[in-house]
């Protein structure tokens, strides 16, 4: 039962992150992520952000050229590793305001319980 509750919480973290990005809600992004936050890009480059503001600046600069408006999950698959750590395989699409597809992507989110909350500590991404 506890594992199911934790899976729901972890899925909720993923949804909070996307809902916050889609709503341009920096406070929500702050709640969904641990900082420092780490991102391993498809190229192998590693980004580290010490605040939601830093990540937000990077994200908006990265997505402004392709007309990004919102993202939606195609799948969220959490896998419990320890009592305080999940890996979450996600697939998602990025869309323009007219709902035309920019691209489909796969990511591995590392969600941990730390600092009295469940939040995303890191991600390995394809887009």
Identify the residue ranges that each predicted region occupies.
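Short, low-complexity N-terminal intrinsically disordered segments enriched in polar/charged residues
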Residues: 1-31, 35, 41, 53
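A solvent-exposed, acidic/Ser-Thr-rich amphipathic alpha-helical stretch
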Residues: 27-76
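Short beta-strand segments enriched in hydrophobic/aromatic residues
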Residues: 33-34, 92-94, 124-125
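Short Pro/Gly-enriched beta-strand edge/turn motifs at strand-loop
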Residues: 57-60, 89-93
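A short hydrophobic beta-strand element
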Residues: 70, 82-92
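Hydrophobic/aromatic beta-strand elements that line small-molecule binding cavities or substrate pockets
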Residues: 73-79, 92-94, 106-112
